[in-house]
Amino acid sequence: MTVEEYFRFEESSPIKHEYVAGEVYAMSGGTVRHDRIATNVLVRLSLVARPGPCDVFSSNMRVEVARDRYYYPDVTVVCTPVAESDIVARNPCVVVEVTSPSTARIDRGEKLDAYRQIATLRAYLIVDHRRRRVERHWRDVAGE
């Protein structure tokens, strides 16, 4: 499937899908606990982001990791202008994934490697859904 076909497919789909190099992966529904954690993170980051230039988005905002890779993180922070009609965040500075039993390995492996390729990304946070633990992956000012 091409990227263009993926975007057309997503327009009419009742569920969200992530796109990785031509493959489409359905996003399963989360638990109440997962959603509660993601909402708490979103609210806290929104309070910190205001009144500055940053926008904080829920898992409904797709992130372009590369031209052939699109994910729906649980929370995304973008500090560059975003048009109201945008359906993709291209310059995130913070991405948050809340793990689930089916995604923990991917969040810590494939997605960690992919998110590291985003030049604007300063932090990738992985929130463990089972216990009070946040893994922080930072990039310093020099981009390291």
Positions of predicted regions on the chain:
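Gly/Pro/Ser/Thr-rich low-complexity, intrinsically disordered segments predominantly at protein N-termini
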Residues: 1-144
